[in-house]
Design a protein with these regions (language model features):
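Active-site helix of classical SDR
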Residues: 118, 154-157, 162
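Canonical Rossmann dinucleotide-binding motif of NAD(H)/NADP(H)-dependent dehydrogenases/reductases
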Residues: 2-33
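C-terminal substrate-recognition "lid" of short-chain dehydrogenase/reductases
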Residues: 2, 115-118, 214-243, 248
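The beta1-alpha1 cofactor-binding region of Rossmann-like NAD(H)/NADP(H)-dependent oxidoreductases
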Residues: 39-40, 57-68, 100, 219-220
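Substrate-binding pocket helix/loop in short-chain dehydrogenase/reductase
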Residues: 93-95, 99-105, 206
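Alpha-helical segment proximal to the catalytic Tyr-Lys
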Residues: 123, 167-171, 234
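Residue(s) in the substrate-gating loop at a strand-loop-helix junction
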Residues: 138
């Protein structure tokens, strides 16, 4: 029970990777704060956990983030762990044809949003005596891919921000790391495969994307997140861990 009585905030916690990771934290004794722009989804997840609070949070809105973290601290009195996970993919477009609204939306949520959670989350952690943060980057933040420049821009920025925050707060008891998953098998990806013109071909294509055959599950990623957030990783800070079956190593 590595997280017994620790207060854990998960952004984007209403579905997918956020939900799977929240359930893992709860199974190891954590008190969960499920933050999501989808209020109904957050309440659904929170109500299924032993000790959890649902908060409505638009991570791209600083006021919403500040309010949500204040709700968490008001309920539990402290904040020990943050899984800074909320994000979007955006539209696939060539850079010279990029719709500016698409660029701004991805930057606001994936870039500004991660900063806002760090800004207000670290402030709460310092008042609690320290803590651990895990940001969600992507293999797209470590390598170049076509037609997803806003996503790559923001996910690479998370890598740099993770390092900066880790160095800035190491002496004050706050560790900051990141995970960089490849494509993960979530309900959204399952839906994408099922609705492809040739679902079996799409599945085979995705399963051969990385050197290690197959597609990691949300639970595969959650295991790494929990390690980084736990005392097992007490001397690990400032790092981004690819969860990619060797994709970045090629």
């Amino acid at each position: 029970m590595r997280f017994r009585d620790r207060v854990v905030l998960v952004t984007g916690g209403a579905s997918g990777l956020g939900e799977a990771t929240a359930r893992r934290f709860a199974a190891e004794g954590g008190k969960l704060v499920i933050a999501d722009i989808n209020t109904e989804g957050a309440e659904r997840v929170a109500s299924s956990l032993p000790d959890a609070l649902a908060v409505t949070m638009d991570t791209g809105d600083a006021t919403s983030v500040e309010r949500g973290i204040a709700e968490a601290v008001a309920r539990y009195g402290r904040l020990d762990v943050i899984f800074n996970n909320a994000g979007i993919d955006g539209q696939q477009q060539a850079l010279h044809e990029m719709d500016l609204a698409n660029w701004e939306k991805v930057r606001r949520i994936n870039g500004d949003g991660v900063f806002y959670v760090l800004r207000y989350g670290i402030d709460a952690m310092l008042r609690s005596g320290g803590g651990a943060i895990v940001n969600t980057s992507s293999t797209a933040g470590l390598t170049a891919q076509d037609n997803i420049s806003p996503y790559t821009f923001t996910k690479a920025g998370i890598v740099g921000l993770t390092r900066s925050a880790a160095v800035e707060y190491a002496a004050r008891g706050v560790r900051v790391n990141a995970v960089a998953p490849t494509v993960v098998m979530t309900p959204l990806v399952e839906h994408f495969i099922a609705n492809a013109p040739d679902p079996e071909q799409m599945r085979r294509q995705m399963e051969s994307f990385n050197p290690k055959p197959g597609i990691p599950t949300a639970d595969d990623v959650a295991g790494v997140v929990l390690f980084l957030a736990s005392d097992d990783a007490a001397w690990v800070t400032g790092h981004t861990i690819p969860i990619d079956g060797g994709y970045v190593a090629r």
